[in-house]
Amino acid sequence: MAGGKGKSSGGKSSGGKTSGVDGTKKQQSHSARAGLQFPCGRVKRFLKQNTQNKMRVGAKAAVYVTAVLEYLTAEVLELAGNAAKDLKVKRITPRHLQLAIRGDEELDTLIRATIAFGGVLPHINRALLLKVEQKKKAKAIEA
């Protein structure tokens, strides 16, 4: 140990956290740090492009918006997957998305857009249903 205290580090400092083999930090994306699948960098770029007067966009704002988008997407896909499973189909179609969104009250109020090739929800008036049920009961009693 010539001329110093402790171990000689060969001119490199060992301060901070190291995760690589050679002691260097491994780069990690904002999405990986936040534990998200959606790209935080791309969302931040879109936020910067769509703000007026060249406003600044914080990194945490982009992460928050990305997390919200990921959550809503996961929620819709889960409901659409359930709708596809109920119909015994393995592929999610726009019809399944329509059934999922219109079936959930909160998503229905949030997403008021028209879904292409989504069709319409089946709706039968209650008055008509009651008459049909009464006829079935009458036939069952007669038989």
Curated annotation (Swiss-Prot):
Variant histone H2A which can replace H2A in some nucleosomes. Nucleosomes wrap and compact DNA into chromatin, limiting DNA accessibility to the cellular machineries which require DNA as a template. Histones thereby play a central role in transcription regulation, DNA repair, DNA replication and chromosomal stability. DNA accessibility is regulated via a complex set of post-translational modifications of histones, also called histone code, and nucleosome remodeling. Belongs to the histone H2A family. GO terms for cellular component: euchromatin; nucleosome; nucleus. Residues 1-18 have a biased composition (Gly residues). It comes from the Eukaryota. This is Histone H2A.Z. Keywords: Acetylation, Chromosome, DNA-binding, Nucleosome core, Nucleus. It is found in: Nucleus; Chromosome. InterPro entries: Histone-fold, Histone_H2A, Histone_H2A/H2B/H3, Histone_H2A_C. One of its GO terms (molecular function) is structural constituent of chromatin. The nucleosome is a histone octamer containing two molecules each of H2A, H2B, H3 and H4 assembled in one H3-H4 heterotetramer and two H2A-H2B heterodimers. The octamer wraps approximately 147 bp of DNA. H2A or its variant H2A.Z forms a heterodimer with H2B. H2A.Z associates with the VPS72/SWC2 subunit of the SWR1 chromatin remodeling complex. Also interacts with RBP1/DNA-directed RNA polymerase II largest subunit. Acetylated once deposited into chromatin. Residues 1-34 are annotated as: Disordered.
